[in-house]
A protein has these predicted regions:
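Short intrinsically disordered, low-complexity segments
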Residues: 12-13, 43
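Hydrophobic h-region of N-terminal signal peptides that target proteins for export
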Residues: 13-20
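Eukaryotic scaffold repeat domains enriched in small/polar residues
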Residues: 20-355
């Protein structure tokens, strides 16, 4: 009896010691310095995140004790993230082809959800590519392999699919970029292999297409991501190494970029976004940077370089800018999202304090 009690005491002490064992400090890289811009503007690095473990509340003592005995629970982490968008609730929604699903990070309510192929056995997601949201925070996901657009409600519940690979109306070869015009009730989709932009109604019927293969104005060579901004539809024309801007009816307005090996040109344009001052952000996947242009096509500044430290990227892809000018960049091969903050004129004083 005494021997059994001693053994039990030793086991308990080992468990308690493990529960309170000081953890080795995680290696933290120093944040890059703020980028001081013209007119008192400023770009700051905020943080990065990569898994559900960074959203949910920290586990208490008894939960950690159970983890030691039963093993730590599995947490969803990014595998090969590609596209990102934020909704009106401040949630960050990330497509992850490597995980065959979509991550929803809700930092305000400390919640996380993963949308996967198992959510709809009959018509599963295969390779989720790009994500968009509408005014009601419904989530739209293009699937480049299935040739469809998957629609979920704001809670993440599957609603329906749009399009197919089988021909007929809504026939896609490789749907990639997507944007939703909530006011006009329109959905815009790039079909990368057909070099076209589809304009759909909210039920998925095709209203219009525009574009063809070529290098001229309004022509495409491997179009990928797109964004709506005001009256503009902005399209990444990847293999023409540029970004083209149209009105919402598909009429060409202007283009930015061109192939080259110097700043202001593009080699692998990926994600795009527009800040509150109307400047255009373009991710270059090969160079591992984000370039920022004005509407005249002039390069204003850039940030990032190739690497694994904070503020560095390994094959970055998607980009999204929220209403507070926080910039979310998909750092794909580093398996994380990096967050920056642009402080425009009037949002930051020359003394360095908030106004």
């Amino acid at each position: 009896m005494c021997k059994s009690l001693k053994i039990a005491t030793v086991v308990l002490m080992v468990i308690l010691a493990a529960a309170f064992k000081p953890t080795k400090p995680a290696t933290r890289t120093e944040a890059p310095p703020d980028l001081q811009l013209e007119g008192g503007r400023r770009l700051s690095y905020e943080r990065s995140f990569s898994s559900e473990n960074e959203v949910k509340p920290k586990r208490g003592f008894w939960s950690r004790l159970v983890d030691i005995v039963a093993g730590e629970p599995d947490f969803h982490s990014m595998v090969r993230p590609y596209s990102v968008v934020t909704d009106s609730r401040g949630r960050v929604i990330v497509s992850d082809p490597g995980a065959a699903g979509v991550h929803i990070f809700d930092f305000a309510d400390k919640k996380y959800k993963f949308l996967s192929r198992a959510d709809n056995i009959k018509d599963p997601m295969l390779t989720p590519q790009c994500v968009a949201v509408d005014a009601s925070d419904n989530i739209y996901v293009t699937d480049s392999e299935a040739g469809k657009i998957f629609v979920f409600d704001a809670s993440g519940k599957y609603q329906r699919v749009i399009g197919s690979l089988k021909g007929g109306e809504g026939y896609f070869k490789r749907p990639t970029g997507i944007a939703v015009d909530a006011k006009a009730q329109r959905i815009y989709v790039t079909d990368t292999l057909r070099d076209k932009i589809f304009m759909l109604d909210m039920q998925g019927s095709v209203l219009q297409t525009f574009g063809k293969n070529g290098q001229g104005e309004g022509e495409f060579n491997y179009p990928t991501e797109l964004r709506l901004d005001g009256d503009n539809l902005i399209v990444v024309d990847a293999m023409n190494f540029r970004v083209q801007v149209f009105d919402r009816s598909g009429q060409f307005r202007f283009a930015i970029g061109g192939i080259g090996d110097s700043t202001g040109t593009m080699f692998r344009p990926k994600g795009i976004g527009v800040d509150s001052e109307g400047d255009l952000y373009v991710v270059d996947g090969l160079w591992g940077m984000v370039q920022v242009f004005n509407r005249q096509g002039d390069l204003l500044y850039y940030f990032g370089s190739r690497g694994t430290e904070a503020g560095e990227f390994q094959l970055p892809t998607g980009l999204s800018i929220d209403a507070q000018d926080r910039i979310f960049v998909v750092d794909s091969f580093n398996r994380r999202i990096q967050v920056f903050h642009f402080y425009g004129a009037g949002k930051w004083s020359h003394a360095g304090g908030s106004q």
